[in-house]
Amino acid sequence: MPPQMNPQISETLQPRPEDYAYDLDQALGAVVSVTTIVPEDAFTADILGTERAGSGVLIRSDGVVLTIGYLVTEAETVWLGLSDGRTVPGHVLGYDQTTGFGLVQALARVDLPALKIGQSSSVEPGASVVLAGAGGRSGAVAARVIGKQEFAGYWEYLLDEAIFTAPAHPQWGGAALIGPAGDLIGIGSLRLEQSSEGEDEHLNMIVPIDLLPPILEDLLTVGRPNRPPRPWLGVYAVEIDDNVV
């Protein structure tokens, strides 16, 4: 099994239980590490690597884990590191390229509480949240929602209302965004940089959890959503010397 990640979160960024109205440690206990091995000849191997590591979160008591899809796409081997110290094998249930969500089934009894799925639409900019990777408090960042807006990726990816949080989590892939009520409101996808008043600020882009319920049953049963693919126009533009090419 490849080595699991070490988040290395500064204590000054870690959440404190007294700052939240829910049981922080119980919520963090649902977050797991996700480690995968992908064949060298896989389509995504050159871009994403053959050994991948990130996080996921238990969303059902039977061991279903929600994560970000790029960790598990084309994976042949999956390991889940649980909050009680156990490491169990997993199996990829499904992946949705449109949202970026991936599902993994633990292949052993988990016996840990799942994190309740919340409503990302109810969370506004300024809300106090926790972006949690595996490892309990030492793997989590106390953050705030700094924006909700459209996000478009050049790899044919579009979210109508992505969530942006700061400060940034250094191990963002598959991290659980825990809302003010202690429920799951999103999954970490990217780390971005923006300039504000002459200074660079790092933030995370989160896939909102409201995109999951409409496709969850399809992911569980057939591995992908039962819907037509989104059409894309094949144009790629960049700015060079104040001109668009």
PLM region spans:
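C-terminal cap/linker of serine protease catalytic domains
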Residues: 1-24, 184-245
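A short, Trp-centered hydrophobic/proline-enriched beta-strand micro-motif
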Residues: 26-43, 131
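Short, glycine-anchored, charge-dense loop/turn motifs used at functional sites
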Residues: 32, 62-64, 180-184
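Active-site loop architecture of trypsin-fold serine endopeptidases
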Residues: 46, 75-77, 112, 133-144, ...
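PDZ/PDZ-like domain segments forming the peptide/carboxylate-binding groove
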Residues: 55, 167-171, 175-176, 236-245
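Structured segments of extracytoplasmic/periplasmic soluble domains
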Residues: 81, 132, 148, 215-222
